[in-house]
From Swiss-Prot:
One of its GO terms (molecular function) is large ribosomal subunit rRNA binding. This is Large ribosomal subunit protein uL14. Belongs to the universal ribosomal protein uL14 family. It comes from Gluconacetobacter diazotrophicus (strain ATCC 49037 / DSM 5601 / CCUG 37298 / CIP 103539 / LMG 7603 / PAl5). Gene3D superfamilies: Ribosomal protein L14. Part of the 50S ribosomal subunit. Forms a cluster with proteins L3 and L19. In the 70S ribosome, L14 and L19 interact and together make contacts with the 16S rRNA in bridges B5 and B8. Signal peptide: none annotated. It holds the Pfam family Ribosomal_L14. Binds to 23S rRNA. Forms part of two intersubunit bridges in the 70S ribosome. Keywords: Ribonucleoprotein, Ribosomal protein, RNA-binding, rRNA-binding.
Length: 122
């Protein structure tokens, strides 16, 4: 579960290393986000000469959470750290590579570009 002010790792090569959630999109009273949800983030740490820089505000889709994600078959999957992929206004990833595994739930949310770039889909 991702709340506003939660810090997340960035799982792509957009140039950002750490981001902080500013807002959970999808309703005026929505407080938490899970895997596959879109959030608004601020870049807190970035590498030199990256596509994004510190202080930039972007949208991001959550690809890994430490809070367990329940599946229809009763199983659950969770990760050690929270991670997100930065996306543009057209819901396409800013980076050209994805690092680490992503969850299968992204396919139902129509993030096919992220699924195809990921090295592993769990």
């Amino acid at each position: 579960m991702i709340h506003p002010e939660t810090n997340l790792d960035v799982a792509d090569n957009s140039g950002a290393r750490q981001v902080q959630c500013i807002k959970v999109l999808g309703g005026s009273k929505r407080k938490t986000a899970s895997v596959g949800d879109v959030i608004v983030v601020s870049v807190k740490e970035a590498i030199p000469r990256g596509k994004v820089k510190k202080g930039d505000v972007h949208q991001a889709v959550i690809v890994r959470t430490s809070y367990p994600v329940r599946r229809a078959d009763g199983s659950a999957i969770r990760f050690d750290r929270n991670a997100a992929v930065l996306i543009n206004k057209q819901q396409e990833p800013i980076g050209t590579r994805i690092f680490g595994p992503v969850v299968r739930e992204l396919r139902a949310r129509k993030f096919m570009k992220i699924i195809s770039l990921a090295p592993e889909v769990l």
